[in-house]
Amino acid sequence: MAADGTGVVGGGAVGGGLPKDGLQDAKCPEPIPNRRRASSLSRDAQRRAYQWCREYLGGAWRRARPEELSVCPVSGGLSNLLFRCSLPNHVPSVGGEPREVLLRLYGAILQGVDSLVLESVMFAILAERSLGPQLYGVFPEGRLEQYLPSRPLKTQELRDPVLSGAIATRMARFHGMEMPFTKEPRWLFGTMERYLKQIQDLPSTSLPQMNLVEMYSLKDEMNSLRKLLDDTPSPVVFCHNDIQEGNILLLSEPDSDDNLMLVDFEYSSYNYRGFDIGNHFCEWVYDYTYEEWPFYKARPTDYPTREQQLHFIRHYLAEVQKGEILSEEEQKKREEELLLEISRYSLASHFFWGLWSTLQASMSTIEFGYLEYAQSRFQFYFQQKGQLTSSPSS
């Protein structure tokens, strides 16, 4: 996700001081399976990509000519634009510089410059701890990251018991990290309030967005959600806040037992544990590889069953509770409490991404049915809210 202000979007010029000799269309390698819409890079942006690689990576990147650099889309996100930049084989390495990197260009800006600075700091810390890709360069329009031989998980793989358990363990470790950021859990409602205000401040031409606000009484509903969550105990931990299949890489390391890596930390913050787990469960429903409008497929019946949730929860708690000895009764009590916590915070996930997508519809140039997606999330919100209020345990 990108933040408030001006950002680089698909096809937009980003300027640069390179000579205006034409970049040739370097042949891209076989495309990596796209989770979302891939984006092309304009000629001006290609020149700028060359300049960033040359300046921040040095070595062989300074020797390659602009037309020799391969810049290929890898997987279009709903927030950022991602490209794989590669050196040609005939240009030898000089030292330890990478031969290929991931270029991330911030898309429609929703957060603010301060958030981008914090994200870059966070990214660097996680890289130093070997919990994320290496960071090679940061600039106002984006950054250069380590390109990892890997693939993102597919939506259907989230329900695989082995992978689900591994994701739970990875999430628990992430939650256990100490990070140099505010520990006050203001991110969730602070961000949703900002999104709602930005939607309400849209020009009168943005009628569909305003209709959504009125149709679902979003301001009143947010207050109702806040009251519900105020009455729902949930530990404040360092959360990823967007653990969906596209942000979980399966590394190409067959000999490694720990071959999952979380990426894309732009939403990460101290937040309520229930949101991170509930949000992940919501993502079981949405497949973003659908090739026709609106470029996603929602399958509400794929939301994890009670048993699938318990499978995840038990792996999560096993990591969190290492060294603790609990009675069977106490263990069951923790599991039931966490089930309720997650069911309530999953509502916040739908509400958050519904607002986010409503706002993106007015800003993003990425080909995606943002308004349709927003409506789907709000509909699922009310459906799950109804199930929650009718449940005896709620």
Swiss-Prot record:
- Region annotation Disordered: residue ranges? 1-42
| Gly residues bias spans | 7-19
Q: What happens when the gene is disrupted?
A: Hindlimb muscular dystrophy. Hindlimb skeletal muscle tissue exhibits impaired phosphatidylcholine biosynthesis and increased phosphatidylcholine catabolism, with concomitant accumulation of choline. Mitochondria are abnormally large and exhibit decreased inner membrane potential.
Q: Name one Pfam family in it.
A: Choline_kinase
User: Tissue specificity, please?
Assistant: Expressed ubiquitously with the highest level in testis.
Q: In which pathway does it act?
A: Phospholipid metabolism; phosphatidylethanolamine biosynthesis; phosphatidylethanolamine from ethanolamine: step 1/3
Q: What's in the keyword line of the UniProt record? A: Acetylation, ATP-binding, Kinase, Lipid biosynthesis, Lipid metabolism, Nucleotide-binding, Phospholipid biosynthesis, Phospholipid metabolism, Transferase
Write down the top EC class of this protein. transferase
- Annotated positions of the N-acetylalanine modification: A2
- Per UniProt, substrate binds at G77, L78, S79
Q: Which EC numbers characterise this protein's activity in its record? A: 2.7.1.32, 2.7.1.82
Q: Name one GO biological process term.
A: phosphatidylethanolamine biosynthetic process
Q: What does this protein do?
A: Has a key role in phospholipid metabolism, and catalyzes the first step of phosphatidylethanolamine and phosphatidylcholine biosynthesis.
Involvement in disorder? Defects in Chkb are a cause of rostrocaudal muscular dystrophy (rmd). The disease is characterized by rapidly progressive muscular dystrophy and neonatal forelimb bone deformity. The dystrophy is only evident in skeletal muscle tissues in an unusual rostral-to-caudal gradient.
Q: How does it assemble?
A: Homodimer, and heterodimer with CHKA.
Q: What is this protein called?
A: Choline/ethanolamine kinase
Organism of provenance: Mus musculus (Mouse)
**Gene behind this chain?**
Chkb
